């Protein structure tokens, strides 16, 4: 069973216990999160959900810089920055909480790191453990671009 499906099944009550990532739990709908208990974080499968931008964007180091670029992009190109992600809820919440509002989310089903190269998005949010794939695709993590720390967890349905 896929890790996302475990979260869904716990949320709909058709599963009592399962293993999945903390990131997938936090990405799920709040109604689903309220039905699931983290029994134990397993201290493996550690990764971070991060904001990554193309290396050539040398003037962008922080989220505040990204906010500035987003407004410039909107004013000059008359469109919003496109952010490719498999984590739309966490990405939207994080960017809004940091004051970045001029963006459009692009759903990614895989190989998110390729989106800027193909011109499908200007930046991405993605899960990474070492950053190697990001670097191989000429992307770098913003200094304050960590959205969430994740790891494998034992999860259970909360029985009321």
Briefly describe each language-model feature range.
Residues 34-92:
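A conserved helix-loop-strand patch within extracytoplasmic ligand-binding domains
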Residues 1-8, 104-116:
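Short helix-initiation/N-cap motifs at beta->coil->alpha
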Residues 28-40, 133-148:
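Ligand-binding "clamshell"
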Residues 16-21, 122-128:
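Paired acidic/hydrophobic, glycine-rich loop segments that form the ligand-binding mouth/hinge
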Residues 65-69, 88, 102-112:
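Active-site glycine-rich loop that binds ribose-phosphate moieties when present
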Residues 14-16, 78-82, 103:
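Short active-site oxyanion
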Residues 12-19, 23-42:
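Glycine/small-residue-rich loop that forms an oxyanion/phosphate-binding "nest" at active or ligand-binding sites
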Residues 158-160:
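Conserved small/polar residues in nucleotide/adenosyl-binding loops
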